Amino acid sequence: MDVLSPGQGNNTTSPPAPFETGGNTTGISDVTFSYQVITSLLLGTLIFCAVLGNACVVAAIALERSLQNVANYLIGSLAVTDLMVSVLVLPMAALYQVLNKWTLGQVTCDLFIALDVLCCTSSILHLCAIALDRYWAITDPIDYVNKRTPRRAAALISLTWLIGFLISIPPMLGWRTPEDRSDPDACTISKDHGYTIYSTFGAFYIPLLLMLVLYGRIFRAARFRIRKTVKKVEKTGADTRHGASPAPQPKKSVNGESGSRNWRLGVESKAGGALCANGAVRQGDDGAALEVIEVHRVGNSKEHLPLPSEAGPTPCAPASFERKNERNAEAKRKMALARERKTVKTLGIIMGTFILCWLPFFIVALVLPFCESSCHMPTLLGAIINWLGYSNSLLNPVIYAYFNKDFQNAFKKIIKCKFCRQ
C-alpha cells in the first residue's frame, strides 16, 4: 500500500499501492547512506514483527483445538492475509523506499502493485467479515448458533478475496493511463480517475461505512443487554428489601387434624443481631401447636422461641441478609458497568486503529489523482502515510488475538514448546 512513490513527482495510487508526490524529482544520488541504514533497520523491524505476530496467530489456531471455531477461523484467515502482505509485499516496498527508486523492472512492478492491492484490500475486507460475524452473533444469538458454520466462514473469506481480485486486476487489463508507465524509475498504480474512485471506495470507504454501522449496532445491542441486567439486579434488590412472602399453610396440624389456621415464622431476637432459623413443632402448655425455632445469633448464643399458630403471616427479613443482597446487587451493577466500559474500549480500539492506519492513505489516494500538478505531497509525509497503512498488518494480530486469553494461553504453549512435546 505504497502511498508515496519515493523521491518522485506528483503521481498517485488508489488502494494499497504506490503513488507519487508533487515537487522536484529527487535522484538516487540524493539518498544518503545513513538514511538507507536507518530506514532499513526501521522497516526491517516492522516486517519481522509483522511476520512473527501473524505466524504465531496461525500456529496457535492450527495447534490449539480450543481455538478451532468459526470466529477464530476468520481471525486466522486475516492473519494469513496479513502474513502474505508481510512476506510478498513489504520487502519490495521496503527496497523501493530505501533505494528511493524502482529497480526491479516493469513486469515485477505490475506484479508488486497487483499483490499490494489484492492483499491489503482482502485484509481490510476481513475486518468487515469479522464485524459481520460478531454482529450476527450478538443480535441473533439463538438462531446464529446453527448458522455459524465453517461453510459460512469459508464463504465470507472467499468473498473478501473475490472483491480483492476485482479491484486489483483491472489495471493489468488496461484500465490505466499512458503516463502510468512513463517513468522507469517509478512504480505506480493506475491514475485513471474512474479506477481511482472504483478502487478507493471498494477497498476502503464502503468497508469503513459498513464497519461503523455494524460496530455501532453491536455496541447498542451490548449496552441494552448490560443495562437490562443492571435493571434486573436493582429490581431483585428492591424486592429483597421491601417484599414479603407469605408463610406456608400446611394442610394438617401436628396432631393430624385438618387446620385452617396459618403458620407464622416471625422471629425477633431480644438481644439483637443476625438470625438464622431452623423450625420444629411441639405441643404447648395450653395444648396449642407451637413451632420451635432455634435461633443462632452473631454472639453464638442460642434461644428457643415458641410461635403461636393463630397469628397471621408476618414477613421477616433479617438485617444481615438484606445487607448482603444490597452488596451483591451493587457488585453486579459495578460489574455490568465495567463490561459496558470494556465494550466501548474494545470497539474504540478496533475502529480507532483501523481509521488511524488507513484513512490518511485513502484520503490522499482519492484526492491526488484529481489534483494533477497543483497538489504537492512532501516526501517524508508520503512515506509515513504509506507505512502507516502497512503497519495495520502488524497491529491486527495484536488487536484480534493477543488481547484474547485463549490465544494468550496458546502462545505460552508455543513459547514453552509444549506442542512439540505432545
UniProtKB/Swiss-Prot annotation:
InterPro entries: 5HT1A_rcpt, 5HT_rcpt, GPCR_Rhodpsn, GPCR_Rhodpsn_7TM. A motif (NPxxY motif) lies at residues 396-400. Its main location: membrane. Pfam families: 7tm_1 (PF00001). Residues 60-73, 133-152, 217-346, 404-422 are cytoplasmic. Disulfide bonds join C109-C187. G-protein coupled receptor for 5-hydroxytryptamine (serotonin). Also functions as a receptor for various drugs and psychoactive substances. Ligand binding causes a conformation change that triggers signaling via guanine nucleotide-binding proteins (G proteins) and modulates the activity of downstream effectors, such as adenylate cyclase. This is 5-hydroxytryptamine receptor 1A. The gene is HTR1A.
